[in-house]
Amino acid sequence: MNFEEAEDINGVRFAWNTFPCTKADANKLVVPTGALYTPLKFREDLPIAEYDPHCCLNTHCRSILNPYCQIDPTGSWICPICGNRNPLPSHYQGISNENLPLELNPNSSTIEYITARPVANPPIFFFVIDLCQDEDNLKALKETLVVSLSLLPPNALIGLITYGTMVQVHDLGSESINKSYIFRGDKEYTDKQINDMLKKPVVVPAQNFANSLTRFFLPLEEVEFQLTSILENLTKDPWAVANGDRPLRSTGSALNVATNLLHSTFQGYGARIMLFSAGPDTLNPGLIVGPKLKEPIRSHSDIDKDNAKHYKKAIKFYDALAAKLVKNSHTVDIFAGCYDQIGMSEMKNLCNKTGGTLLLSDAFTTSIFKQSFLRLFNKDSEGYLLMSFNGTFDIKTSKELKVSGLIGNASSLAAKTNNVSENEIGIGGTSQYRLCSASPQHTYAVFFDIANTQSLPPNSQSYIQFITHYQHSSGTYRVRVTTISNILTSEDAILTQSFDQEAAAVLMARVTLFKSEQDDGADVLRWIDRMLIKLCQKFADYRKDFDESFRLSPQFSFYPQFIYYLRRSQFLQVFNNSPDETAFYRHVLLTEDINNSLIMIQPTLTSFALDSEPEPVLLDSVSIKDDRILLLDTFFHILIFHGKTIAEWRKAGYQNNPDYANFKQLLDEPKQEAAELLVDRYPLPRFIDTEEGGSQARFLYSKLNPSTTYNNQTFTGSNGAVVLTDDVSLQVFMSHLQKLVVSGSN
């Protein structure tokens, strides 16, 4: 079974598909023994059991009955994780290979249980809307929100906050008048203060919820008309904005009120706060930039030099909100609809720690916002939302392994079980994590430490079990269980054959991003270079001090170029990006699966020509030809680039002449392929149509390996375009790598 087939079945890809036998051997591998796991990955033939799972009785284990368990005919099963013997359920007595229960079937290495435990509350959606925006932007946002109401479950509980200079909490239960409670936008309120203000007697005390805070969250089917009317009648914040000033915007206060209101009403139940912001917070708490336009918003340079005077204070405020949200199992989604930065860099942990969406768009009028937001409410074949709520993620391991940590949109539950390693990678010190929200695309990097210190017999097995508890949109609690077995070996040849360079590249990319949040950018680049050199010194074939002897086996041959493109990517090279853009890009990479992550790291390039089939080509400047059309997919952008000759023919209108039908077809082919890429992509990519000499051609040139540059004229003319850059090409990068490896440098 190849790596992709295993991923299709279990949603798991390992960097090393066999593990080193001892801790000492593991330390020599450079790339950690880690896995990328997509808990809710769609699988058409997923085994589903409509009963509760059977757990190991060892209180320090509690792993779940699975196909790797040894079944004793006398009526017991032996747990492969801890070795404990457990009694089989009475109705499983006398089972055989011909009548195995579903969870013991060899095809049930991944299985989902629908438990008998009911969900007390439907999912909760809490809209938080910025009114400091122009009428066109606000109008487009209102229209999209009204459309989204038709996509929510009818029983979903809905709440609404609008804010500008003040924060308004809307009482949707008030039928006769539109009623709201006003909070100051420049004040941080405690739970008690919010409770005291909102629990004051209301106009209609006869209603059951009259004096309860739950009256601010009502079933959509009961308040849809009222809510639609409120949304349609929202207007721009009336607070005057003086010349030379920014609007007084209270995003931090609005999020503070929303977080505390949910904390007081629905602790431990699935809820999403959806923030729609059109600019930066200019009021404390959570201030991003001062109200005077003469004060510029912070840049990467300001942050690096510690010149961003509001940055650390804002991060501290939003991180405190994130901690409360995680404790309550609530999620935050942030949608930006403006050219300005809104403060995503400061607010990113609201989404990163809760599994929420971070979406950057130029305006709420754009398709990127509209379609991406509505795709968040995609449904499965039974009509249920493709989003989970209120989840936990447990990692069980046999005694040979320990959990080093996790990197992804999750938070630690701080449960230090006996399989937790002291060597932390990412979010460590635990084997249990909170997944406030997840989708079928959410992927988590899990890292393991080899605990074994002694040699083992050949073909010794280790076991890993991933257990994901979550609230399903249908109103049931479910448990997704994946159990994996890996061989432990001391032979380098077997380890080499088991290396998945794609998974390894994505795992190392996640480790690199995690380091980037703590360390200096130059130090991170030096670290990833050292790791690549060490890996090649361990697994490449070469003769010392002889460059031409350097060879990598097919299992490793693409890995250096993945690292090359990662070094050049917007994830690490932040010079041309704002802090908000960097936060957005990194958030998406920490969310997506291997295939999408690789597209982000090393974009794909397809060439189209007359009278020939489309073909993948090198992501290289030599691929630019006058008579070709190129389709670039960076995940965030889909770009169609017309070569010089093609662009001239298009301007001349040849495609409108029936005699040149094949040219018209050539122009249409990349558009059709681009449309197919756009169908399922989340968030929706930006579409760019450009040509040789066009202003937006820079998006293509910035991604290409510059093998033909202004100071390297070896391949000019018809052999490719000249790239105006001082960046090192892949060829030079590989040459330096070979020299360092064969010389024994680090």
Curated annotation (Swiss-Prot):
GO terms for cellular component: COPII vesicle coat; endoplasmic reticulum exit site; endoplasmic reticulum membrane; Golgi membrane. InterPro entries: ADF-H/Gelsolin-like_dom_sf, Gelsolin-like_dom, Gelsolin-like_dom_sf, Sec23, Sec23/24_helical_dom, Sec23/24_helical_dom_sf, Sec23/24_trunk_dom, Sec23_24_beta_S. One of its GO terms (molecular function) is zinc ion binding. Pfam families: Gelsolin (PF00626), Sec23_BS (PF08033), Sec23_helical (PF04815), Sec23_trunk (PF04811), zf-Sec23_Sec24 (PF04810). Signal peptide: none annotated. It is a peripheral membrane protein. SUPFAM superfamilies: beta-sandwich domain of Sec23/24, C-terminal, gelsolin-like domain of Sec23/24, Helical domain of Sec23/24, vWA-like, Zn-finger domain of Sec23/24. The COPII coat is composed of at least 5 proteins: the SEC23/24 complex, the SEC13/31 complex, and the protein SAR1. Component of the coat protein complex II (COPII) which promotes the formation of transport vesicles from the endoplasmic reticulum (ER). The coat has two main functions, the physical deformation of the endoplasmic reticulum membrane into vesicles and the selection of cargo molecules. This is Protein transport protein SEC23. It comes from Debaryomyces hansenii (strain ATCC 36239 / CBS 767 / BCRC 21394 / JCM 1990 / NBRC 0083 / IGC 2968). The gene is SEC23.
